[in-house]
Swiss-Prot record:
Name of this chain's protein: Phosphatidylinositol-3,5-bisphosphate 3-phosphatase MTMR2
Subcellular localization, as worded in the UniProt entry: Cytoplasm; Early endosome membrane; Cytoplasm, Perinuclear region; Cell projection, Axon
UniProt binding sites for a 1,2-diacyl-sn-glycero-3-phospho-(1D-myo-inositol-3-phosphate): 330, 355-356, 418-423, 463
Source organism (scientific name): Bos taurus (Bovine)
An individual GO BP term: regulation of phosphatidylinositol dephosphorylation
GO terms for MF: identical protein binding; phosphatidylinositol-3,5-bisphosphate 3-phosphatase activity; phosphatidylinositol-3-phosphate phosphatase activity
Domain of life: Eukaryota
Chain positions covered by the region annotation Disordered: 1-54, 614-643
Residue ranges, compositional bias (Polar residues): 1-12, 23-40
Biased composition, class Low complexity, residue ranges: 41-54
Family the UniProt entry places it in: Belongs to the protein-tyrosine phosphatase family. Non-receptor class myotubularin subfamily.
All residue ranges annotated as the Myotubularin phosphatase domain in the record: 205-580
Modified residues (Phosphoserine): 6, 9, 58
Length: 643
């Protein structure tokens, strides 16, 4: 029986709030960023309420005031809408890198916050509750040994956070109950924090992506392709967007018959069209051929129409993301793949990318070897045993084959896996990133994510498990993480071709889990509409686009007409240390890399200004020389100017 994919009860009415510092969401071993927006907790008596004149005469008031100051120093910087749910003093964080440290552990409705004043600067650990996968109790009341009684939180971003409580303090139970309640609000019929957080930015990120504008940018509609509203009420396919681009000569009634032959009704629809050859990338789900090898005349005619829309080629390639053995096995479940006998002039290619369960296990193995410490002596063999980079290679190689077929072969392609919302999204978005320089800009990449991932129904709620305590759910899988990893691999091979930097990619992944923004909530466009997310939550793009200097690559040069062909070879791929191993302070650069980005951007702007000034000077001299040369009363001796 299929699990419900509804995202009902995710939120209630929002409260006004302000943006957080991204630094506060990504630092496990350093003090909190000074730029963090925060407010003082209302639960702490304000020191301003004690008069200075009274303090001069009352030692007790003096002690109370100092105590309040210390309490404020130990509390987290709160976002509006955020409030403290529990606080435990004299808790020990078992840091795997720098050793045990004692301090105060605070749970709010948004974050887990630990601060120790024993070190200088103070030791701070700050993690959003959304990143927590599960919470486990360690030891019992009769446990012997130092730090043997406490809690361990297992996180979705590689970390494990372990805290020791004193049995006699009786704080563990309360902290555990509040973590289980607020880290998993969906399981407790509570709102995700995104519905409490509301901020107006200079730009509304929810308006960034407009499907009509994006299709017009691609030259759609044209004589071969039209935009249809057949799915306006999500009745054709509830996981597709309202507007679809389909062959112009296929009427809406036929689309419905095609939908009945495709898994989940996900018919082939256009993702991208080549501006010159008109070769296209279309995406869909598997055909429902079953073991009997059923056929659909409407589906065959539909793919023929896709092929005919491209006059440059009389062939079409069907890229099935799955290993062939998996595709064959799907026939027993009523699915399958296209027969080359039924689809004339079509060539079927299997890309051998494994399913969500294999990828989940691969990430689990990767986590074991990178956190908390790396075993140097067996590092390469351990990394190879996870198969993580092998999976990254296959995804990149598949996207590369698609891009090459469209660009060099001038041939249209159809891409699908089983349901068309996991591996298909990886392949189409990466191929489009290789083919179209627009998607390599910051805003263009945001549009790409909105279009190929969000509007076309990647099941973020199920794959990430926002606010859900069922950590062993078989639907969890790092599909989007793999996509971002592939993008990072491309930025390594083409360091000047992308407007965004590594910090941009890490920020997206951090907020994939944080539940601070509404961008990655729910499983489909229809569900986001029902939840009214654009009005009730803040878009991640609003936050990012309000401080673009943090996310801009100083080496970027516009290559809008260039097609990128990354090398999908194990020799050219590497583990993304900046993400997977970032919690280890020994693996961090001494200076945050995004600070260096800012310095380089400022330097580039300074040099560009000098170049412009020199160009104006040369232009002015050239104009003056021309005027003097054109005057009959003046004899001008040529002067060579060296700049």
């Amino acid at each position: 029986m299929e699990k419900s994919s509804s995202c009902e009860s995710l939120g209630s009415q929002p409260a006004v709030a302000r943006p957080p510092s991204v630094d506060s969401l990504s630092s496990a071993s350093t003090s909190h960023s000074e730029n963090s927006v925060h407010t003082k907790s209302a639960s702490v008596v304000s020191s301003d309420s004690i008069s200075t004149s009274a303090e001069n005469f009352s030692p007790d008031l003096r002690v109370l005031r100092e105590s309040n100051k210390l309490a404020e120093m130990e509390e987290p910087p709160l976002l509006p809408g955020e409030n403290i749910k529990d606080m435990a003093k004299d808790v020990t964080y078992i840091c795997p890198f720098t050793g045990a440290v004692r301090g105060t552990l605070t749970v709010t409705n948004y974050r887990l916050y630990f601060k120790s004043m024993e070190r200088d600067p103070p030791f701070v650990l700050d993690a959003s509750l959304g990143v927590i996968s599960r919470v486990e109790k360690i030891g019992g009341a009769s446990s012997r040994g130092e730090n043997s009684y406490g809690l361990e939180t297992v996180c979705k971003d590689i970390r494990n956070l372990r805290f020791a409580h004193k049995p006699e303090g009786r704080t563990r139970r309360s902290i555990f109950e509040n973590l289980m309640k607020y880290a998993f609000p969906v399981s407790n019929n509570l709102s995700l924090f995104a519905f409490e957080y509301k901020e107006v930015f200079p730009e509304n990120g929810w308006k960034l992506y407009d499907s009509l504008s994006e299709y017009r940018r691609q030259g759609i509609p044209n004589e071969s392709w039209r935009i249809t509203k057949v799915n306006e009420r999500y009745e054709l396919c509830d996981t597709y967007p309202a507007l679809l681009v389909v062959p112009a000569n296929i009427p809406d009634e036929e689309l419905k018959r095609v939908a009945s032959f495709r898994s989940r009704g996900r018919i082939p629809v256009l993702s991208w069209i080549h501006p010159e050859s008109q070769a296209t990338i279309t995406r869909c789900s598997q055909p429902m051929v079953g073991v009997s090898g059923k056929r659909s005349k409407e589906d065959e005619k539909y793919l023929q129409a896709i092929m005919d829309s491209n006059a440059q080629s009389h062939k079409i390639f069907i890229f099935d993301a799955r290993p062939s053995v998996n595709a064959v096995a799907n026939k027993a479940k009523g699915g399958g793949y296209e027969s080359e006998d039924a689809y004339q002039n079509a060539e079927l290619v299997f890309l051998d990318i494994h399913n969500i369960h294999v990828m989940r296990e691969s990430l689990r193995k990767l986590k074991e070897i990178v956190y908390p410490n790396i075993e140097e002596t067996h590092w390469l063999s351990n990394l190879e045993s996870t198969h993580w980079l092998e999976h990254i290679k296959l995804i990149l190689a598949g996207a590369l084959r698609i891009a090459d077929r469209v660009e060099s072969g001038k041939t249209s392609v159809v891409v699908h896996c089983s349901d068309g919302w996991d591996r298909t999204a990886q392949l189409t978005s990466l191929a489009m990133l290789m083919l179209d320089g627009y998607y390599r800009t910051i805003r263009g990449f945001e549009v790409l994510v909105e279009k190929e991932w969000l509007s076309f129904g990647h099941r973020f709620q199920l794959r990430v498990g926002h606010g859900d305590k069922n950590h062993a759910d078989a639907d969890r899988s790092p599909v989007f993480l793999q996509f971002i990893d592939c993008v990072w691999q491309m930025t390594r091979q083409f360091p000047t071709a992308f407007e965004f930097n590594e910090y941009f990619l890490i920020t997206i992944l951090d907020h994939l889990y944080s539940c601070l923004f509404g961008t990655f909530l729910c499983n489909s466009e229809q569900q986001r509409g029902k939840e009214n997310l654009p009005r009730r939550t803040v878009s991640l793009w609003s936050y990012i686009n309000s401080q673009l200097e943090d996310f801009t690559n100083p080496l970027y040069g516009s290559y809008s007409n260039h097609v990128l062909y990354p090398v999908a070879s194990m020799r050219h791929l590497e583990l993304w240390v900046g993400y997977y191993v970032r919690w280890n302070p020994r693996m961090k650069p001494q200076e945050p890399i995004h600070n260096r980005y800012k310095e380089l951007l400022a330097k580039r702007a300074e040099l560009q200004k000098k170049v412009e000034e020199l160009q104006r000077e040369i232009s002015n001299r050239s104009t003056s020389s021309s005027e003097r040369a054109g005057s009959p009363a003046q004899c001008v001796t040529p002067v060579q100017t060296v700049v």
